[in-house]
Amino acid sequence: MSQNKYWQSFGEVNDPENLKNLSQDEFQEELPFEGFDDKGLIDAKAPRRDFLKYLGFSTAAATLAASCKIPVKKAIPYANKPENLVPGVAKFYATTYVQDGDVVPVLAKVRDGRPIKIEGNKLANNSFAQGGTSARAQASVLDLYDMYRAKFPLHKVKDKFEEVPTFEQFDKLVGDAMKAAGGSVVLLTSTIVSPSTKEIIAKFPNLKHVQYDAVSYSGMILANEASGFGKRIPSYNFSAAKVIVSLGADFLGTWLSPVEFAKGYSKGRKIDEKNPSMSKHYQFESFLSMTGSNADERFTHRPSETGAIAVALLAELGGAVAPSIADAKMVASIKKVAADLKANNGAAMVVSGSNDKNVQIIVNAINNAIGAYGTTIDWTRPVNYRQGIDSEFAQLVADMEAGSVGTIMIHGANPAYNHYDADKFKAALKKVKLRVSFSEKMDETAELCEYIIPNHHYLESWGDAEPKTGIVSFQQPTIYPLFKTRPFQTSLLRWAGDTKDYE
């Protein structure tokens, strides 16, 4: 054990007793007010001399503080003032927030050339977000000024990233490496909702495109295909539903398109002359959610009972054999909900948050039985977000493990962080000869890549989005790119041999 002794000052070494006394008496003089603690400041008594002393000190301090002027900051005018710019007066630009499959038409508030606030665009197409916005969209302006953004193209040399001075040099490095890698070329992205981007991807020679979503809706897509509706997700009209039944779908919080659903849901919950009755909302779930907390009636169950409850509900509607459920209260609740669905045939809907294909097939059968299709659920205008298929991503990982993938380019996806088997993905990714990332930040997946060419932030970009078939929203830049970044679409064009720019 160490025998070293430590002191805070020389006084503690030379004269510890005196130092102790001095420290105890440092604030020995008490306030010269009698009865301050009991009577308060108004009734306190103090000697005239002490009163004048403290009054003089406070007056002098106030005079001194007032005489200290705040440093003058001079505003330097523009040498060439931008057109239609008034210093201090904000302007608004309509654009579209697109990230990880989420799509929200927004208005960006720009002051002195800098975006400072994001709001919903009430002038956008009323059949989608209807002027709503989300917490993620509101916070996205902070990403623009994030000090950890990738500021220029990077190339990993001996486990250390180095800056590539020009885009031309970067394109040559990647082009040469792509030829040397051989094998198949794969583009891994989150769901792409941009029609123009899809065209560019389709023109890239011998490119395999795999879409991956951190929150998967693969079970729903495959169930819809098995039910004869095609490999797609329908539009849900919550405003037209008099009865809403949710089987674990947090449609006001995170499920599919909560901004759009919250707007429709709120319309059905308001009572006025045109709508004298309010919609009824039943929620079956295993944990409390934003949607569950707003339900008229909420029923809790174990996560393992989700499928049984869906089958029991279908059985009450005459479409299946009722399963055995031990909870008598739950059985009674299911009967009550089924009766309400029957009474509102054609004006009800059932949604499920399960990613189990079989559960979603049962939910489709329930909606068919209550006449939801064509009224509250619309197949004529399917959505284009959340299109990732789990089996396609699993096949990609298997191909990487087998060494058949020569080049992989990754945009808007971070499976090394948010995939349930991230370690397996990391090990497979390391077997790919050429790994390129378009990430705006050095995330867990980008760290494993050899080349990084950061994409523009959406507030710096031109672009388009089609969240639903026939509904298009556009992106426009609200600020000049802050760093040496480039649209990932332009990179694809360059590496495909096209000299055009995306923007």
Report each predicted region and the residues it spans.
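Non-catalytic alpha/beta scaffold blocks inside enzyme catalytic domains
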Residues: 165-169, 180-181, 205-206, 212-503
